């Protein structure tokens, strides 16, 4: 071969005798595409929140689909079989990411690492009859154990449903997206600790607490919270450039509201209703909740203007709108 002759001549002549020269062609920096930049932002956010990235095979066992109680009508039950699998535990292409990540968690727990926050960004494969399978890029998150190691001043709390929900909401905010989170019914999640994730009315994922009986199948004995999101919308619509505004010079006004709320009415729905009533409402939060004869929920609403100091009349008018809006909902009364 021509290159072999050149190499042999150079060896005989002596590599040290060949002068160093600058390449004739100009060096160009590779520009990352927009989607790769969104992925980097997504990963940076999760790492800054204390998550570690895991990478798994894109395979799973057929029994994993059965373990997670996926019904035949669900697209995630339509797996692509592998002709020559490395083992029966990896006999099909994965249709969702939970089984492999739960195995990662079990592996670490068995080695004494019990406080775990991990994520994986990878592809899932859905069978499409005689055609090539559909490939989707998904993001999977998992949290289990305590928030931190033991601390002399206080006992660290365990992760819960609201921790995984807060991470998903924070990710949406970082990417300039609006996720709508509603009560869900995934078969492998605990009742009342399960939610679906929507953008513009389209479901893109789920989050919640994995059922104890399913965790035991993977030798996990501690509560585990997970989420899985399809990334196509995120990559297309994620915002990379933000416009910052100055910290407001004018003081906030704070009002507290207490309502009796039926169990059937989601508190998140009430928070969204309050936020949408006025651009002067900058935050809404629940600061107290108790149940005696009825469930009582107390909200703290913060008002602020970037242009002027708010007058009492302005805040009082919005306050009355909040009361009128919420008391129109069936099952809600003002607590006096």
Predicted regions and their residues:
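Glycine-centered flexibility sites
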Residues: 14, 50, 122, 145, ...
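Residues forming anionic-ligand binding surfaces in small-molecule and nucleic-acid pockets
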Residues: 12-27, 78-83, 124-154, 249-256, ...
